[in-house]
């Protein structure tokens, strides 16, 4: 089972937030097609500019993931310097992992998030704009709301 991430573009200068969608949504599904079907049932759409719902200058609010975009946890995220990677690991219970590939500019560390909640909490705190900032939809029907510690 994989998790597919849908990150909302603030088309028109605002995010749509309700009890189904928010800034970032993570959906557990067998494949991208199933995740897209679930996303559409939550109110996401893919043609907002063409349909006149989204700002043509800002772009579409939502984009579909690629078929190979699914995340499996534990999930290695990053390309950080060692100090920043260590700080993230300490704050979110993640693990430090040296990159297997060549580093770029000394950014040779990944952060290994063990759970979707750890990953989404990090993203909410690092890039959060909304309350809540993330929803996680599990295949078993559970929904978890993620709140940024920085958004009041």
Regions found by a protein language model. Give the residues of each.
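Short, mixed-charge low-complexity intrinsically disordered segments
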Residues: 41-152
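Short aromatic-glycine-(Arg/Gly/Cys) micro-motifs in beta-strand/loop hairpins
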Residues: 1-22
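A generic structural signal for ordered secondary structure
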Residues: 3, 26-28, 143
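Short, flexible N-terminal segments of the mature chain
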Residues: 16-43
């Amino acid at each position: 089972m994989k998790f597919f991430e849908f990150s909302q573009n603030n088309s028109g200068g605002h995010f749509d937030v309700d009890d189904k969608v928010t800034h970032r949504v993570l959906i557990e599904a067998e494949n991208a097609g199933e995740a897209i079907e679930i996303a559409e049932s939550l109110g996401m759409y893919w043609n907002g500019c063409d349909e006149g719902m989204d700002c043509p200058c800002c772009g579409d609010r939502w984009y579909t993931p690629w078929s190979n975009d699914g995340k499996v946890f534990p999930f290695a995220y990053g390309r950080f310097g060692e100090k920043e990677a260590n700080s993230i690991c300490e704050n979110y219970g993640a693990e430090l992992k040296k990159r297997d590939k060549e580093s770029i500019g000394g950014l040779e560390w990944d952060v290994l998030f063990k759970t979707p909640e750890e990953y989404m909490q990090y993203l909410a705190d690092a890039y959060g704009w909304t309350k809540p900032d993330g929803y996680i939809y599990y295949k078993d029907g559970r929904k978890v709301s993620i709140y940024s510690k920085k958004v009041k």
